Amino acid sequence: MEAPAAGLFLLLLLGTWAPAPGSASSEAPPLINEDVKRTVDLSSHLAKVTAEVVLAHLGGGSTSRATSFLLALEPELEARLAHLGVQVKGEDEEENNLEVRETKIKGKSGRFFTVKLPVALDPGAKISVIVETVYTHVLHPYPTQITQSEKQFVVFEGNHYFYSPYPTKTQTMRVKLASRNVESYTKLGNPTRSEDLLDYGPFRDVPAYSQDTFKVHYENNSPFLTITSMTRVIEVSHWGNIAVEENVDLKHTGAVLKGPFSRYDYQRQPDSGISSIRSFKTILPAAAQDVYYRDEIGNVSTSHLLILDDSVEMEIRPRFPLFGGWKTHYIVGYNLPSYEYLYNLGDQYALKMRFVDHVFDEQVIDSLTVKIILPEGAKNIEIDSPYEISRAPDELHYTYLDTFGRPVIVAYKKNLVEQHIQDIVVHYTFNKVLMLQEPLLVVAAFYILFFTVIIYVRLDFSITKDPAAEARMKVACITEQVLTLVNKRIGLYRHFDETVNRYKQSRDISTLNSGKKSLETEHKALTSEIALLQSRLKTEGSDLCDRVSEMQKLDAQVKELVLKSAVEAERLVAGKLKKDTYIENEKLISGKRQELVTKIDHILDAL
């Protein structure tokens, strides 16, 4: 029975194999998964799948050596892959991680990866490798809504078999759950259950690309905490400091809270809101200082900071516990000494920092944007990253004493987990002479300030003394006053005319006498002021003095006519003058008076 089975197995192998890029010959070496031990860790909100694979080169008449092999992802989970790593078993150093590159297989859909072997595999040889994959958002709450007092149950669907382009001789699967409370699970191969473990297999002679749905429904109250968006800003200064600030948007992606929230029950009953998140710990670099933690309202005083030998542990406690569907936003910032992360050789600089740092255990970051602000004048910027990242066009950042802006590297990546906490290296060139730019700008600014003050106190910025212009200004001012006084004097005449008209109607001689007295008094005062201004004009040597003198003579004649009109009115009232004669005389007086006023107006216009 052994020989026919082996022949059939080899036939399946040759029939399902597709050539891998980088093979030693045009015909792909026949490989087989001799033994696979899978561990599926579902104890958190991540699905961590670790497979210990014994890969064998069958030979089968082929003399070509295998320099690489293929990995395939399950179609149901491939879209949620966050991390894929392959390592030779027994070698724990990060430097011994095998090179993994995504590839395509003709005629096959899905995601495939080529893994380069450290040593070419001869026919009949074997190698043990460990394949580690981490998937996010594959544990779905069921029911999707729970009350504050209920526990959270989730459903996971995967594959009973190790999904591979190669046949597998034997394989087992161990599933680690978050609790012993299991509602249901698939029963393929009569699995054994012990506490929070499910053991499947062994499965023998499994063909390539085999699939059989594995499903488990169990209690999982671990924190389903997800960073939906995060912006990490790293500002580098050559004066000894690196400032780091992280803007974090958090969401509880577990079962949504149904019904009201009772803080009283939450504090009184230990199991109330068991799947909620009260606080979590963030690990900062050991050299972190000036740490701050705030949100939209302001500083959050419920946080705690613990300084350890190799790190700074920060307990972040939001203002309210996070239940399913609830969100929060906060900002964490700190400073680092640049000598621990910035290296240079002449004008060549290298910044070695983590692309993403620890935020909380079992972290998931849906979207991360990293902005690295380099000193002004940095050029020839290059980035070395341990994994693929995307870059947006570089930006410019302006701050104090900047002239043409600091270059900003903008990089982003989606779906990150703890395995992405690795260093990136930013290489750039910087002329050290530019370090003097800011001090020189400060010196120049103070120099200009002091020089301006010296000039200001030594120069006379008052209006230039021009005798002619000053005389003209004085004459204009005096003329303006003369015009005002003349207008007031003309107003007196009009007011006296109204008094005469009232006298003719009332025949009250006291009214007329009072009006005459008021006219004489005010006219005398105004005429005196005009005469004084006339003398000032004469002092200034202005030819306007003669015009004012002429206007004064004309005004005297106007006054005489005004008083004569009043006398005529008295004679009319006393019956000494006939009305016809009065009217005729009044016309003559008014005509002469109007002629004089017109002459005065012409003089005023000339002024």
Swiss-Prot record:
<feature type="modified residue" description="N6-acetyllysine">
    <location>
        <position position="187"/>
    </location>
</feature>
<feature type="transmembrane region" description="Helical">
    <location>
        <begin position="439"/>
        <end position="457"/>
    </location>
</feature>
<feature type="cross-link" description="Glycyl lysine isopeptide (Lys-Gly) (interchain with G-Cter in SUMO2); alternate">
    <location>
        <position position="538"/>
    </location>
</feature>
<protein>
    <recommendedName>
        <fullName>Dolichyl-diphosphooligosaccharide--protein glycosyltransferase subunit 1</fullName>
    </recommendedName>
</protein>
<dbReference type="GO" id="GO:0042470">
    <property type="term" value="C:melanosome"/>
</dbReference>
<keyword id="KW-0325">Glycoprotein</keyword>
<dbReference type="GO" id="GO:0005789">
    <property type="term" value="C:endoplasmic reticulum membrane"/>
</dbReference>
<dbReference type="GO" id="GO:0160227">
    <property type="term" value="C:oligosaccharyltransferase complex B"/>
</dbReference>
<dbReference type="GO" id="GO:0005829">
    <property type="term" value="C:cytosol"/>
</dbReference>
<keyword id="KW-1017">Isopeptide bond</keyword>
<comment type="similarity">
    <text>Belongs to the OST1 family.</text>
</comment>
<keyword id="KW-0007">Acetylation</keyword>
<dbReference type="GO" id="GO:0018279">
    <property type="term" value="P:protein N-linked glycosylation via asparagine"/>
</dbReference>
<keyword id="KW-0256">Endoplasmic reticulum</keyword>
<dbReference type="GO" id="GO:0005783">
    <property type="term" value="C:endoplasmic reticulum"/>
</dbReference>
<dbReference type="GO" id="GO:0008250">
    <property type="term" value="C:oligosaccharyltransferase complex"/>
</dbReference>
<comment type="subunit">
    <text>Component of the oligosaccharyltransferase (OST) complex. OST exists in two different complex forms which contain common core subunits RPN1, RPN2, OST48, OST4, DAD1 and TMEM258, either STT3A or STT3B as catalytic subunits, and form-specific accessory subunits. STT3A complex assembly occurs through the formation of 3 subcomplexes. Subcomplex 1 contains RPN1 and TMEM258, subcomplex 2 contains the STT3A-specific subunits STT3A, DC2/OSTC, and KCP2 as well as the core subunit OST4, and subcomplex 3 contains RPN2, DAD1, and OST48.</text>
</comment>
<keyword id="KW-1133">Transmembrane helix</keyword>
<keyword id="KW-0812">Transmembrane</keyword>
<feature type="topological domain" description="Cytoplasmic">
    <location>
        <begin position="458"/>
        <end position="607"/>
    </location>
</feature>
<dbReference type="Pfam" id="PF04597">
    <property type="entry name" value="Ribophorin_I"/>
</dbReference>
<dbReference type="GO" id="GO:0160226">
    <property type="term" value="C:oligosaccharyltransferase complex A"/>
</dbReference>
<feature type="modified residue" description="N6-acetyllysine; alternate">
    <location>
        <position position="538"/>
    </location>
</feature>
<dbReference type="GO" id="GO:0005791">
    <property type="term" value="C:rough endoplasmic reticulum"/>
</dbReference>
<keyword id="KW-0832">Ubl conjugation</keyword>
<dbReference type="InterPro" id="IPR007676">
    <property type="entry name" value="Ribophorin_I"/>
</dbReference>
<comment type="pathway">
    <text>Protein modification; protein glycosylation.</text>
</comment>
<dbReference type="GO" id="GO:0003723">
    <property type="term" value="F:RNA binding"/>
</dbReference>
<feature type="glycosylation site" description="N-linked (GlcNAc...) asparagine">
    <location>
        <position position="299"/>
    </location>
</feature>
<comment type="function">
    <text>Subunit of the oligosaccharyl transferase (OST) complex that catalyzes the initial transfer of a defined glycan (Glc(3)Man(9)GlcNAc(2) in eukaryotes) from the lipid carrier dolichol-pyrophosphate to an asparagine residue within an Asn-X-Ser/Thr consensus motif in nascent polypeptide chains, the first step in protein N-glycosylation. N-glycosylation occurs cotranslationally and the complex associates with the Sec61 complex at the channel-forming translocon complex that mediates protein translocation across the endoplasmic reticulum (ER). All subunits are required for a maximal enzyme activity.</text>
</comment>
<feature type="topological domain" description="Lumenal">
    <location>
        <begin position="24"/>
        <end position="438"/>
    </location>
</feature>
<dbReference type="GO" id="GO:0006487">
    <property type="term" value="P:protein N-linked glycosylation"/>
</dbReference>
<dbReference type="GO" id="GO:0016020">
    <property type="term" value="C:membrane"/>
</dbReference>
<keyword id="KW-0732">Signal</keyword>
<keyword id="KW-0472">Membrane</keyword>
<feature type="signal peptide">
    <location>
        <begin position="1"/>
        <end position="23"/>
    </location>
</feature>
